[in-house]
């Protein structure tokens, strides 16, 4: 992180990242961040070059870089956009491309801020499959409670910058009173239709 916390600690594999001698560079190669707005993340002219950036920065050989990039593009189902210029892409295409940039890094941890924003139903479903297949830690900030219900086993509900509760996703996301007290609604899949 850029700003040290005023309290608490962050540990990776049991070691505080604030301990003397800890190499943040090593941690940065293990953690991927998907921004809420892909325009803040994508900066190259085309998708292929952008997705190559992270693996190249790891110092990987070009053959491995291309292998990772092609795998990430295929995993996200955007290999057909490989050479497309970013400024010509839709919001959903940019979001999927920004996720591919992180997957190409093969991180141990993915941090995502509102990952389903701007996605059409097919790409949203694809994202859910990707998240369910991701075998490592994923930390997701989202108001898409249906997606959270499908992809996360644990939920930390926050309101006004404070933790309201921390627990089993199904228990929290099925508690209508708790959700409404904190400005949320039941996931759509659990709401009764009003006709």
Where in the sequence are the language-model features?
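Conserved ABC ATPase signature
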Residues: 85-89, 93
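H-loop/switch region of ABC-family ATPase nucleotide-binding domains
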Residues: 142-143
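Catalytic Walker B motif of ABC-type/P-loop ATPase nucleotide-binding domains
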Residues: 110-113
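Conserved ABC transporter NBD signature motif
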Residues: 8-19, 27
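Conserved beta-strand-loop-alpha-helix hinge in the C-terminal portion
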Residues: 162-185
